């Protein structure tokens, strides 16, 4: 059984127990517009993962979110999965309460109820993973997310999934360098797809821990990178974030 299959099985059980929740409906932001110019960093709150185990068990989520924003992050991603990533919707709320930049609810979303919870707890963006959803369901959840004021980041891992994502209108596409079936990581996943689709605005996700990696991805066409584990392992995430931002400054020079 792959990691993804196991996680989705758990999500099906979780969703069945989710109670109705108040959803404040607002106008969604245009994440695609935000990311279309320049080079951006999406910084992540990620306590653990199935492949790496515990990354940082004790963390002041609000403090770290403020550090991310201060250092120039364009958006903050928050893992809300509890079983496999030790995250929570409480983490999401703590981040949303203290920053002014967009906040991404990063989870394995398969149902509208999860989107309701994401919006209720302060997210402005939700992650939808092509590999986890039938194309019809992907379209349905995208429409529903926007109807309650959430923009979406649509995640792909290969060209077949990218073609499905491109059928959606005006969405930002993230390329996960981590294979969700095996959890193995390769930056070549992003580099290959970005070179073949230079007209698409892409976020490169996973496996970015150095300035050299960030620069390589930007040169290949990334408009943004999502950095989680590397920042969470840092006692001083501001330093690493500022170093990663130098890629953007050098491109301007």
From Swiss-Prot:
Keyword Cell cycle belongs to the record: no
Any single GO BP term: L-tryptophan biosynthetic process
Reaction(s) this enzyme catalyzes, per UniProt: 1-(2-carboxyphenylamino)-1-deoxy-D-ribulose 5-phosphate + H(+) = (1S,2R)-1-C-(indol-3-yl)glycerol 3-phosphate + CO2 + H2O
Highest taxon above the source species: Bacteria
Assigned protein family: Belongs to the TrpC family.
Stored CDD domains: IGPS (cd00331)
Gene Ontology MF, one: phosphoribosylanthranilate isomerase activity
PANTHER family named among the record's database cross-references: INDOLE-3-GLYCEROL-PHOSPHATE SYNTHASE (PTHR22854:SF2), TRYPTOPHAN BIOSYNTHESIS PROTEIN (PTHR22854)
Protein name: Indole-3-glycerol phosphate synthase
EC assignment: 4.1.1.48
Record key words, sorted: Amino-acid biosynthesis, Aromatic amino acid biosynthesis, Decarboxylase, Lyase, Tryptophan biosynthesis
Pathway involvement of the protein, from the record: Amino-acid biosynthesis; L-tryptophan biosynthesis; L-tryptophan from chorismate: step 4/5
Keyword Lyase included in the entry's annotation: yes
InterPro entries: Aldolase_TIM, Indole-3-glycerol_P_synth, Indole-3-glycerol_P_synth_dom, Indole-3-GlycerolPSynthase_CS, RibuloseP-bd_barrel
A matching Pfam family: IGPS
């Amino acid at each position: 059984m792959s990691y993804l299959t196991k996680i989705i099985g758990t999500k099906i059980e979780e969703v069945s127990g989710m109670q109705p929740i108040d959803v404040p409906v607002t106008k969604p932001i245009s994440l695609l517009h935000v990311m279309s110019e320049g080079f951006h960093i999406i910084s992540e709150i990620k306590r653990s993962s199935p492949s790496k185990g515990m990354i940082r068990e004790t963390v002041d989520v609000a403090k770290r979110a403020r550090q991310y924003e201060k250092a120039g992050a364009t958006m903050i991603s928050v893992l809300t999965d509890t079983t496999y990533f030790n995250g929570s919707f409480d983490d999401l709320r703590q981040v949303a309460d203290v920053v002014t930049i967009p906040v991404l609810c990063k989870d394995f979303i398969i149902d509208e109820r999860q989107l309701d919870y994401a919006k209720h707890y302060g997210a402005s963006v939700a992650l939808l993973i092509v590999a986890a959803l039938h194309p019809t369901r992907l379209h349905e959840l995208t429409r529903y997310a926007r109807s309650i004021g959430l923009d979406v980041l649509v995640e792909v891992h290969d060209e077949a999934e990218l073609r499905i994502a491109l059928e959606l209108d005006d969405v930002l596409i993230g390329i996960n360098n981590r294979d969700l079936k095996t959890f193995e990581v390769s930056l070549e996943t992003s580099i290959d797809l970005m070179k073949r689709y230079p007209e698409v605005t892409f976020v490169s996700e996973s496996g970015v821990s150095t300035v050299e990696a960030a620069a390589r991805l930007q040169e290949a066409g990334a408009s943004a990178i999502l950095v989680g584990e590397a920042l969470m392992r840092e006692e001083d995430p501001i330093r690493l974030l500022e170093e990663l931002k130098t890629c953007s400054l050098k491109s301007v020079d």
